[in-house]
């Protein structure tokens, strides 16, 4: 176990919807990688208890997915609220990455960051202001090089989504970045 300011923090949240003003976080997971995207450690995967009033406002898509993957039941049984989940996640991160040294990494992380700012501000502050958003690369590839499109499973559990994001970025890295020869 070594703290390193080059390590990357990957995060994924599952939420009851996309509007951070009314929807809530129901699952959080984190993974630490090195700069070459090798997994160093997996953080806690935490279902976050939410009142029934927050569960019932989920749209049809979220309800279907999270019933199928068992997350709704895990949320209803969870002993963690947002504050406890935030503390446990930060405790894990402190073992691997200094505060504000890692960009927030994942897919559509701007969306996760909005929810973190509202419900887990200490965790949101743990990240550097920059981000490594795999969705940006995916959108560019889909438009400019559609033959290289990467298909994801999209089971929508936080840890599985992180692993898919790392695999996806590794795919793009090998195809587009590792082939570039440059000199300083």
Curated annotation (Swiss-Prot):
Localization terms from the record: Cytoplasm
Enzyme class (EC, first level): hydrolase
Gene3D superfamilies for this protein: Ribonuclease H-like superfamily/Ribonuclease H
Gene Ontology molecular functions: 3'-5'-RNA exonuclease activity; nucleic acid binding
Domain Exonuclease: 8-169
UniProt keyword list: Cytoplasm, Exonuclease, Hydrolase, Nuclease
Cellular component per GO, a single term: cytoplasm
GO biological process: DNA metabolic process
EC number annotated for this UniProt entry: 3.1.15.-
Listed Pfam families: RNase_T
List of catalytic residues: 129
Family the entry assigns: Belongs to the oligoribonuclease family.
HAMAP family assigned to the protein according to its UniProt record, in alphabetical order: Oligoribonuclease (MF_00045)
Function in brief: 3'-to-5' exoribonuclease specific for small oligoribonucleotides.
Protein name: Oligoribonuclease
Organism per entry: Buchnera aphidicola subsp. Schizaphis graminum (strain Sg)
Encoding gene, per UniProt annotation: orn
